[in-house]
């Protein structure tokens, strides 16, 4: 069992998942983050590991490692997720669902790539100058200067920039338990559709992530964007794959995780 803390964003309110169990703290770059985080941790003394999900930027990594040092407990574990707002919100909710299913925190940390692959994120933006990605090239900047043009981005196992419109095969992968988590300008939603064909998942439950994206995340830098994350709300298959997968290694040092980790001696956190 573990608890999930979202640093700088809300959890996606998927009705069938325990999103209400996710605690929301300020973004790590905000001046009051350390005080708010320490107040929460000290007011809820527990032996249960806490996973602090953040946007994976250098600032967030530094502040969360500082928090872990000040608090002095190895059970406070930062989890960097290099995804935009819908991906962060969805990941926090999925982690809370896996905790409810009894998945061990060590297995969750070592199986994080599989968890990120559980959701599919697509986005369009009219501007790429705010994107902190090595994949952004000169041609993407030139395209974003054309009136009415958008740059498409897809988040799978890797980040793809300038991808074509979604094909029918992608929509065919959406199952009956899927939900859509979205953010940004809904007027751009049609730009994610297949050529000449609207996206076929209009009947799926749709959840809006309220509030702005973290300003230091290095994503859109503009209001003229739209992002959509599609995930399956039934996590039982995912939990089974994580529990039996070959990727059980400590994210801190790469040691194989069995009952403990020699790097951080986190026996309670990794069983």
Predicted regions, residues:
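Cys/His-clustered metal-coordination modules, chiefly Zn-binding fingers
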Residues: 179-271
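Domain-scale terminal segments
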Residues: 1-196
């Amino acid at each position: 069992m573990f608890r999930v803390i979202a640093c700088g964003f809300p959890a996606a309110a998927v009705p069938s998942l325990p999103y209400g169990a996710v605690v929301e703290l300020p973004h790590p770059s905000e001046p009051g983050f350390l005080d708010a985080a320490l107040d929460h941790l000290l007011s809820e003394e527990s032996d249960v590991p806490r996973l602090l999900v953040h946007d994976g930027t250098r600032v967030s990594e530094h502040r969360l490692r500082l928090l872990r040092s000040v608090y002095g407990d190895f059970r406070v574990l930062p989890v960097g997720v290099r995804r935009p707002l819908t991906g962060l919100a969805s990941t926090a909710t999925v982690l809370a669902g896996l905790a409810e299913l009894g998945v061990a925190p060590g297995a969750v940390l070592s199986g994080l790539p599989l968890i990120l692959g559980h959701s599919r994120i697509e986005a369009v933006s009219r501007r790429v100058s705010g994107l902190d990605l090595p994949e952004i090239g000169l041609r993407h900047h030139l395209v974003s200067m054309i009136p009415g043009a958008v740059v498409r981005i897809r988040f799978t196992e890797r980040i793809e920039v300038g991808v074509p419109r979604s094909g029918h095969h992608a929509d065919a992968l959406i199952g009956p338990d899927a939900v859509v988590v979205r953010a940004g300008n809904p007027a751009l939603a049609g730009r994610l559709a297949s050529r000449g064909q609207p996206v076929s998942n209009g009947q799926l439950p749709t959840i809006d992530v309220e509030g702005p994206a973290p300003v230091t995340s290095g994503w859109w830098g503009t209001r003229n964007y739209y992002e959509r994350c599609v995930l399956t709300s039934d996590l039982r298959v995912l939990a089974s794959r994580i529990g039996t997968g070959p990727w059980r290694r400590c994210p801190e040092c790469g040691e194989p995780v069995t009952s403990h980790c020699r790097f951080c001696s986190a026996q309670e956190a990794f069983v």
